[in-house]
A protein has these predicted regions:
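Rhodanese-like catalytic fold shared by cysteine-dependent sulfurtransferases
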Residues: 1-13, 17-51, 61-92
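Short, surface-exposed ligand- or partner-binding patches at beta-edge/loop junctions that are enriched
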Residues: 56
Length: 92
């Protein structure tokens, strides 16, 4: 599956790891905000999301770090969606 197919998967969850301030300035409807600095302490929440789990941020750097951390914790169906505006363009 390519990224667009993953984002539009009926069971996909999208998590934005930007700060709450950045999130409030604009975000994709239906996206959950869990800032990067809270990913580790909120690991149990990530385990409850339906998959595929798509992570996004401003440019893809923070979401990439979060995705690598989650994969290292045993979550397998996790993807770095890149910047939230890119995810928005791919969402149908």
């Amino acid at each position: 599956m390519d990224l667009q197919e993953l984002i539009n998967h009926p069971e996909a969850s999208i998590v934005d790891v930007r700060t709450p301030g950045e999130f409030n300035e604009g975000h994709l409807e239906g996206t959950v905000n869990i800032p990067l600095d809270q990913v580790e302490e909120r690991l149990d929440e990530f385990k409850k999301f339906s998959t595929p789990l798509i992570l996004c941020c401003r440019s893809g750097m923070r979401s990439g770090r979060a995705a690598e951390f989650l994969k290292a914790q045993g979550l397998s169906d996790v993807y770095n969606g890149g910047g939230w505006t890119d995810v928005r363009l791919l969402k149908q």
